[in-house]
């Protein structure tokens, strides 16, 4: 076991680099948790059936999204290794492959929800009204699974390049300045379904902003590798 002298410049720089990469992700998760509590308050205003349906459908949604999050994590490691090795073509190909997998997953998931969404809800409740509301949520959100997955793919590539600050900023901005205000506004016009559409709209805006940032190649202070994707 090698004991590091924390007074050395090497360990100090490593610690700073670790904090620079890891701290934004921690802040992001805290902000997201608080934002979801605020969103839950809007959902709760539509009654217990809507709240129950949102909770049950949200569990299904979370299970589905885990596949994309796993893909994003794998891509981050892949990009980090290949950027470090100077294999920039592999980074480009890896992102393209991840987007293809995301597309196939999104289409398969939406198809499954369209035909079996109500049966998925039966795993959590037998209340017909709750099942109906839950399937409504899943159908609307299912239309945005590819968008959500694409956002996570690009975020994975950015994190692999060492840029965790930008994904954090976009995530917090889209949640607190876009999703929650839109949820209030849309729900006042279209009722509870407006909340689901607000979530989808915030994902689209987040993907657009992230893709532009990714495309112009400002992902990190290292190599401008992303513009070729």
Q: Where do the model's predicted regions map?
A:
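Single conserved hydrophobic/aromatic residue that forms the stacking wall/gate
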Residues: 1-10, 219, 223-229
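Small-residue-rich hydrophobic transmembrane alpha-helices
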Residues: 54-117, 148-170
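Alpha-helical transmembrane segments of multi-pass membrane proteins
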Residues: 68, 128-151
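Helix-terminus/linker motif at the lipid-water interface of multi-pass membrane proteins
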Residues: 30-59, 63, 81, 119-128, ...
């Amino acid at each position: 076991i090698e004991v590091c002298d924390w007074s050395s410049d090497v360990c100090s720089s490593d610690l700073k680099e670790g904090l620079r990469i890891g701290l934004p992700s921690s802040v992001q998760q805290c902000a997201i948790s608080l934002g979801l509590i605020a969103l839950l308050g809007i959902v709760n205003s539509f009654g217990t059936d809507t709240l129950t349906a949102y909770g049950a459908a949200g569990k299904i949604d979370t299970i589905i999204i885990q596949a994309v999050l796993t893909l994003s994590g794998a891509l981050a490691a892949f990009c980090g290794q290949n950027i470090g090795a100077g294999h920039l073509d592999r980074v480009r190909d890896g992102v393209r492959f991840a987007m293809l997998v995301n597309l196939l997953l999104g289409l398969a998931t939406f198809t499954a929800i369209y035909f079996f969404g109500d049966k998925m809800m039966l795993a959590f409740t037998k209340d017909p009204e709750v099942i109906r509301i839950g399937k409504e949520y899943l159908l609307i959100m299912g239309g945005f699974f590819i968008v959500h997955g694409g956002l996570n793919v690009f975020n994975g590539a950015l994190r692999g390049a060492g840029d965790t600050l930008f994904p954090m900023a976009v995530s917090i901005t889209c949640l607190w300045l876009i999703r929650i205000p839109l949820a209030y506004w849309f729900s006042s016009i279209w009722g509870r379904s407006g909340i689901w559409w607000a979530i989808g709209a915030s994902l689209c805006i987040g993907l657009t902003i992230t893709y532009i940032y990714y495309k112009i190649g400002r992902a990190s202070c290292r190599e401008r590798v992303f513009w070729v994707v």
